[in-house]
Amino acid sequence: MQRHELPPGRRSPATRITLLAILLFLLFGLRSFAGYAIEIEWWKELGQLNTWFSMLYYGIAPVAVATLVAFLALWISHARALKFAGTGLGEHKLYARISTLALLFLAWFIAAGAIDTWTVVRFAGSRGLPAAAAGWHDNIFNKPLSFYLFDLPFYSLLRSYVLAVIIFCVLLYWIAARGWQLRFRMPHLRDAQELDPAFFKLEGGLESRFLRGAAVIGLIALAVRFYLGRYEMAYNEHGSFLVGIDYVDQNIGLPLQWLVIFACLAAAAFVAMGRWFLAALMALALVVDFAAPRIVSALYVRPNEISLQRPYIETHIHATRSAFGIEQNVREVEFKAKPEAPIDVAANKPLLDNVRLWDTRAFHDTVTQIQALRPYYVFADTDVDRYTIDGQYRQVLLTPRELDLRQLPAARANWINPAFIYTHGYGVVLAPVSQITPDGLPVLFIENAPPEVKASSLKLTRPELYYGEVTHEPVFVDTAREEFNYPSGESNVTSRYEGKGGFPISSLGMRMAAAIREGEPNILLTSYLKPNSRMMIHRKVEDRLHELAGFLEWDSDPYLVITDAGRLVWMIDGYTTSEAHPYARSVDVPDIGRVNYIRNAVKATVDAYDGETHMYVFAPDDPIISAYQRLFPDLFQPSDKMPADLRRHARYPETLFRAQAEIYRTYHMLDPQSFYNKEDLWDLARHTTAQNGGAEPVTPTYVVATLPGEAKPEFLLLIPFTPRNKDNLIGLMVARCDGKSLGDMVVLQLSKQELIFGPMQIGARINQDQTISKDLTLWNQQGSQVLRGQILVLPVGNTFLYVDPIYIQATEARMPQLKKIVLAVGNRLIYADTYDQALAQLSSGAQALVTEATAPGSSTAPKAAAVAPATGDARLQSVRDHLRRYRELASQGKWSDAGKELEAIEALVK
């Protein structure tokens, strides 16, 4: 055979294709490989390389296996279609190669769309877990919670995948068979009229053994779908009073599901025998399955709903409480509050010394003005915590001083600044919550740069923050350039990194990978990188944990802790969530989404200097985290491995508490009839936000208080409730944070017969007090603005103390100063310049600034608090009765009638 030589300078087609492939790889693949190289070094830095390989495997393997299975099914379908058309793949080799690649892509498309890898991975991780691990069991189907969290989602996914493969196989078979038949006929057709339209119909192939086989498999898969649908009835919603299986589902729906399953299997048998018409009779079973439950519900259940649905409502109540962790961990206490009971200031000094006078928003604005030092320093967040300072248990506010070069665009424009020089924040501001300077500013225990620590028991040895809430760019440390540390007068103090954070970056390969990943060629060209230089990435705490354990939900509010050694360590809460808890109501959780199961399973720590990251399991009985522990054994540690100085600062997370409070306000009703009728529905208490009467729901508040039956104050997370559409207090939900009590919850249930003022009512009394209202109006008109914090509700002894700090700030400068303190106990208001003055009046019972409760809207001026003389039991009881009726009428807004009760009281005490 004669060979044809290519002219000089011309390349063969194969060479051109090879060069094009190399070019495409350089354009699209090199950056991915560079990213993988950097990520591998990051995982090695954390000591979690095995975890990364496991995640890579778990992410690829399920889709790869599903792709292979789908490809085999599609290839067989394609081959049988060609055989039906009278040809075969062996006769068309180029077509065979192209079609094989196309089928492989189609198989991947089906697998990637149908397979959720984490559903498969969680199912694999749950194998071998004890069935009773979660402590909840479905008595209708006799299934543990793990079946609904892991098994049912996996089986449902598998069913959907099989049905998708069957549908694509049938379509492929028809298209390929008819396409090749048409190709063979086209050369013999003289015009389009000779092509019979019936040729394109499917009926001609119904006798194909392949189509019958595919239909049989599809009908069996459909039977499996209805079988699994029995369990999915546990998610049926029946109005606002029931989720899960109800009377109709159990007595009509479940038996009919077996009828439909039998019909599907019978149809599969008829199709296998070629009796397609008989298989179509399956539709009758579907009609019965659709209509019968609705008829029974309308004609029999609805007229007798509460009596028939009672056991199912009870199941729903307990399932929902269990799903949100309020069935096992909540202790409900009847709190017999006495609103007018005096407060012993001396006996409650540890508690009163920790009353939070600084609202976090006001504190943030003030600290930003007096402690930011430079424009590029920001205080991103203020957190509430507790420390033992010089022997005293103190509640404090703490905020880190982080560096954010986005505040200085000019400095950021030079690549050297963010990468080598401005690498870290510096120091924190820490203040006790209840101490105020004469100027109305917070007393600071830690301030300035370098840090000035004013408490002997606190120390700060590593104030640098390389990892934080606003750190967003990679940096290089231990380089030839010194780093900016903190400002000092007109100059700056520099430093060199002395820790072990980051990974080596000095080699040519790593520098090239970093340059490609970041799109910054200067990384490859710079002379500042030394043999010991390291690169820090994923420095934002939340992003770091999402990279490390993205299968968990992470709280959006990390908080900083000062360890005994003086290091700064971030703590952040991680959650396991699901929408698969049967019989349970779902709620929307901020930053997470809609869930009906949540646990605070993990608490993570990130060293602000080194980036050292650990995850500790705090819910070992949670089946989801147990499955992840089996999958990633190197990633998690038990909670008792957390260092003691960090464990002291673990707290109950606000995100979880909000979700539980939202559920509890309805699901505190355990009686099915009360629940059905919503007889005792609660709301989150509201509070006044401005002098004009604006209101919004209160947010959970960290406080230091003493629970009934406890000997000393402790760190608590608290939220008050009111009856639906009312403002008087009906209960307080409290989560404990200290020591072995961490995670325990207490609900103080108040008497429905005793009117206890809520935050909104206290706010209304404050706004309508003539003296206070006059001051607020005056301050809002003199180039200043009044700010109000959230009114605190604190249980003290057998009564409640309400605290409302009032701040003032200039309209052109946001630096709030604490101007006044309002304390309220029962009917008394104390309005003072300082907290110490208010406590002195509370202790002495002084009346100069203590006013009587005046009905909101009343024009009566405040009077000295009246005390009923003890001149006889009958008269005293009468005073109590009138006072009780006054409170009831005041809570309902019936001020005219309430005024008459006050007049009756005045007549009795004169």
UniProtKB/Swiss-Prot annotation:
Predominant location: membrane
Membrane topology classification: Multi-pass membrane protein
Membrane-spanning intervals of the chain: 17-37, 56-76, 101-121, 157-177, 210-229, 252-272, 276-296
Record localization: Cell membrane
Keyword hit for Transmembrane helix: yes
GO cellular component terms, A-Z: extracellular region; plasma membrane
Keyword vocabulary terms for this entry: Cell membrane, Membrane, Transmembrane, Transmembrane helix
Keyword Transcription: no
Pfam family name, one: UPF0182
Family assignment from sequence similarity: Belongs to the UPF0182 family.
Protein's UniProt name: UPF0182 protein Acid_6445
Taxonomic lineage: Bacteria, Pseudomonadati, Acidobacteriota, Terriglobia, Bryobacterales
